[in-house]
Amino acid sequence: MQVLVRDNNVDQALKALKKKMQREGIFREMKLRGHYEKPSEKKAREKAEAVRRARKLARKKLQREGLLPMKPKPAFGAERGRPGAGGPGAGGPGAGPRGPR
């Protein structure tokens, strides 16, 4: 895999490399090959992935046909983890430990 470095801008080249690797699925492959996966576990994982893909395809089809509402786009800054976004795990004033469990 090749990435051009323009004007000695290594940060931009690294960003482009990570994007290419993500698109090619290299990170996912590395994670899967990080430890041995039993054939039965591999089969179960692949089956679950196929079910997930089929559900997603069916959901998209229903949305296109107008039988399901389209997923609303989040308001600007309302993404999870952004400052001032609110919601679970967002922090903010009064955010502290959850307390005893």
UniProtKB/Swiss-Prot annotation:
Residues 36-52 have a biased composition (Basic and acidic residues). InterPro entries: Ribosomal_bS21 (IPR001911), Ribosomal_bS21_CS (IPR018278), Ribosomal_bS21_sf (IPR038380). Pfam families: Ribosomal_S21 (PF01165). PROSITE patterns: RIBOSOMAL_S21. Residues 83-101 have a biased composition (Gly residues). Residues 36-101 are annotated as: Disordered. Keywords: Ribonucleoprotein, Ribosomal protein. The keyword Ribosomal protein applies. Residues 53-62 have a biased composition (Basic residues). GO terms for biological process: translation. The keyword Ribosomal protein applies. PANTHER family: MITOCHONDRIAL 28S RIBOSOMAL PROTEIN S21, SMALL RIBOSOMAL SUBUNIT PROTEIN BS21M. This is Small ribosomal subunit protein bS21. The gene is rpsU.
